[in-house]
């Protein structure tokens, strides 16, 4: 619907699929009656009967064909809504997780680190290799091994690299190579500090 004018209040549920900033404005215009559902991992539950179905993966037209089920998080205002959302979600996926709002917020933040920031790091690496005329295929095995460790939950124990080794000579050389990219340089410094802090004995 482009507008809630003339909305049928006898509907069982209304699925609000808009940007996060618009969700609660749209829900405020929906007449009382139907259960209200949104799809944001970061926003609170509706202030009326309903809930959240959050797909823990970006949905894009070019990735419509999936080799694995789309994981869905369910959070609801009450048991009745939770059951209804479960029935709806099962039409989409067999991989469901029931998380309360606090857990969902934590999961969303973890997803930003695991996916959004990770993807941005890959984009930086791809741009840097393009600028230095390196073939991206050089790094396929390295990236595959990194993600295999992540799937096993072993990322911390498998950490390698100059930051981990406190290799000052290499770190300084890398920072010198990033002088033309000040944002990347600051990110490099921050990531180096984070790695070294995480692996400093208590």
Question: Can you describe what each PLM-predicted range is?
Answer:
Residues 1-65:
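Rossmann-like NAD(P)(H) cofactor-binding subdomain of soluble oxidoreductases
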Residues 10, 29-33, 91, 131-132, ...:
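Alpha-helix C-cap/termination motif
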Residues 15-20, 36-40, 50-59, 72, ...:
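Long, contiguous hydrophobic alpha-helical segments, chiefly transmembrane helices and signal peptides
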Residues 20, 53, 79, 115, ...:
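Electropositive phosphate-/nucleotide-binding environments in soluble metabolic enzymes
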Residues 25-26, 84, 173:
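Phosphate- and divalent-cation-binding pockets in alpha/beta enzyme and binding domains
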Residues 37, 42, 48, 56-65, ...:
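Predominantly flavin-linked oxidoreductase catalytic cores and closely associated redox partners
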Residues 64-152, 198:
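Internal alpha-helical scaffold of NAD(P)-dependent oxidoreductase catalytic cores
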Residues 144-202:
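Interdomain hinge/lid region at the active-site interface
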